[in-house]
Amino acid sequence: RDVAPSRGLGDVYKRQLLLHGQETFLCGKESCNKGYIRHPWYGKKVGYIGDSITDPNCYGDNIKKYWDFLKEWLDITPYVYGVSGRQWNDVPRQAEQLKKEHGEEVDAIVVLMGTNDFNSSVPVGTWFTEKEEQVMAARGETKKLETRKRRVPIMTNDTYKGRINIGLSHLKKLFPDKQIVLLTPLHRSLAEFGEKNVQPDESYQNKCGEYVDAYVQGIKEAGNLWGIPVIDFNSVTGMNPMIEEQLIYFYDSGYDRLHPNTNGQERMAHTLMYQLLSLPASF
């Protein structure tokens, strides 16, 4: 699953990665001259957890993936574990494999997952159960037991939010000192892969009566609940296959308006490169 770094690839492109600020420039190279700052993710080792949009085997060499562009531009070493069709209940398995194969050498982890939970009509569910319990407390007087309502995260693979709770709990425990970044699912349109695999566009609800928006919102909420930064790929990539003119970013206007093509993956990579400027890759 390792994708070996190619030092020297994309050097010409790297020299073009200069962002003019008031007094400084962004440098996409290992060593930077005075007046330049280095991208915080330059040269880092990053694990990628996800589905077909991340999977190197999805369309093979026909699509250059976003993480491959980041390898070229920022010399990121990618450890790619995304598998086509996988849902949030596969996050623990992918995380365990990353831990086993790369342990402490990985600097950061990026998770792009959720679109298949929507397509498979996994119920959204709720984040917590609540019940009254007694707890010791004091506010300027002698401490005493008080009855208060307490919430406990729901850990179940039967719901989307339960799966996210399990997955993020697992990631936090396996990689307590590593940067973890969540990406919201992209917009989606018609995908027709055969008689037994036809996925309507996002204007339709899934079988449990939810629009894809609920699954996007779930990732945003999870960031606050678990203390994990979220990049809203659903909006900031600017890609929407429901707009005919934007199908230039998707694989095939006839049967696959779901998967970004190389142009779409490059736009994703550009977006991610700039968004990651605000986040440290390691601590």
What does each of the following model-derived ranges do?
Residues 21-84, 92-104, 109, 244-245:
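Serine-esterase "nucleophile elbow" of acetyl-processing enzymes
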Residues 4, 53, 260:
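Glycosyltransferase donor-binding loop in the core domain
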Residues 13, 17-19, 256, 262:
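Intrinsic low-complexity/disordered segments
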Residues 1-16:
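Single conserved hydrophobic/aromatic residue that forms the stacking wall/gate
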